Amino acid sequence: MMEEVGTAGNNLGATEIDHDEQNTFLRICRTGSIYELMEVTPFFGGDRHLLHRYDRHGRQCIHTVAWHDRANAVMKIEILMQSGVNINAKELGTGNTLLHIAASTGNYLLADWFCQQLGVDLGASNNQQETAYYIAYKMRDRKMMKLLRAHGVAYNNTLSAGLL
């Protein structure tokens, strides 16, 4: 049985939402409960366009979950994966993956979970040619760097640039 960790609690304050984003699905991804997400996913059926649609920030639903609901990100993303979401999807504007977002937000649980998934690109670079490891390095997040190294994330580019 899944147990919800808590509310989104992102401390970001109010955000402006496009009219096309004022739908139940994206609200649930952003701040809804795990149970709400479980209730709506069976209604996707053969039409999974919401899973792959980008919002005005260039984010798909999995990116929205990772940025806005750190406490429940892993459980929500697992539910979305069962519905057919692409775990390797990148944000349009930044090219960030879930691992980049986890490194940027200090979400160790999400980073650890992501690194254990099959078929993920642990060395993906975003549009600024930054890896998740490099983001952790820039933020001086030694705990994230250690976690990523433990999962075999390559940090050779950082080392060769004298940044380790």
Swiss-Prot record:
Keyword Repeat part of the UniProt annotation: yes
Family: Belongs to the polydnaviridae I-Kappa-B-like protein family.
Function: Suppresses the host immune response through NF-kappa-B inactivation. Possesses ankyrin repeat domains required for NF-kappa-B binding but lacks the regulatory regions required for dissociation from NF-kappa-B and degradation. Therefore, prevents host NF-kappa-B release and subsequent activation.
Organism encoding this protein: Microplitis demolitor bracovirus (isolate Webb) (MdBV)
Gene (UniProt): F2
UniProt keyword Repeat present: yes
Keywords linked to the UniProt accession: ANK repeat, Host-virus interaction, Inhibition of host NF-kappa-B by virus, Repeat
ANK repeat intervals: 57-89, 94-124, 128-157
Descriptive protein name: I-Kappa-B like protein F1
GO BP annotations, alphabetical order: symbiont-mediated suppression of host NF-kappaB cascade
InterPro entries, alphabetized: Ankyrin_rpt, Ankyrin_rpt-contain_sf
Alphabetical list of PROSITE patterns matching this protein: ANK_REP_REGION
